[in-house]
């Protein structure tokens, strides 16, 4: 189910009311496999390949728009359930449990996220960063006269691909300065 404002929006271009009241839910099939291997008493490796296939995704007909990329407060056009989406990737986790005051966690995701809008063309989604790497590491020391207090030092590092965007259509935006910026839908994300 999409946010409620999607279903009750009035069309900006036609003036019709509640143009999306008959919109159906987005549907999906999920596949995931988890492989966990204990490398030692305190070290765990986990690998999780996955695939998600979305269908009946609301899109604007003959446009690259899809609710899968939605960030706007509301959509002002009629939507149809003709879009698709797919997310394929693998998550890898290496976790060193707290041992002798030391721990770390490394997670990596490599993925591809695509959607098919009302234009029938497969595009990258706005969120197709392709990779994310997180590292967390820490050390703890017992301190105090009775060694009942903990002093810890921790660090976190994140590296990820950039968020995608559609480029501005300069000519169209300048031709209508009284309207908001217009984007080049033929080069979506």
Residue ranges and their predicted role:
Residues 24-26, 36, 48-50, 83, ...:
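Surface-exposed loop and edge beta-strand positions of immunoglobulin-like domains
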Residues 1-30, 51-77, 156-177:
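Surface-exposed extracellular loop regions of Gram-negative outer-membrane beta-barrel proteins
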Residues 27, 31-35, 90:
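Hydrophobic faces of transmembrane alpha-helices in multi-pass small-molecule transporters and flippases
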Residues 182-189:
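Short, intrinsically disordered, charge-balanced linker/junction segments flanking boundaries
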Residues 43-46, 57-59, 63-64, 102, ...:
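Short acidic, gly/pro-rich beta-turn/loop elements at beta-sheet edges
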Residues 51-53, 71-161:
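Gram-negative outer-membrane beta-barrel transporters
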């Amino acid at each position: 189910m999409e946010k409620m404002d999607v279903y009750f929006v009035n069309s900006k271009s036609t003036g019709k009311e509640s143009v999306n009241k008959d919109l159906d839910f987005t549907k999906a099939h999920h596949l995931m496999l988890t492989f966990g291997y204990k490398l030692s008493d305190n070290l765990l490796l986990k690998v999780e390949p996955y695939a998600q296939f979305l269908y009946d995704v609301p899109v604007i007909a003959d446009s690259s728009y899809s609710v899968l990329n939605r960030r706007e407060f509301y959509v002002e056009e009629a939507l149809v359930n003709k879009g698709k989406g797919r997310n394929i990737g693998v998550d890898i986790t290496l976790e060193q449990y707290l041992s002798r005051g030391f721990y770390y966690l490394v997670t990596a995701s490599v993925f591809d996220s695509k959607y098919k809008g009302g234009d029938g063309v497969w595009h990258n989604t706005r969120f197709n960063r392709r990779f994310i790497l997180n590292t967390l590491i820490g050390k703890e020391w017992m301190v105090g006269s009775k060694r009942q207090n903990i002093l810890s030092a921790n660090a976190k590092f994140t590296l990820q691909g950039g968020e995608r965007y559609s480029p501005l259509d300069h000519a169209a935006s300048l031709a209508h300065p009284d309207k908001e910026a217009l984007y080049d839908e033929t080069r979506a994300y």
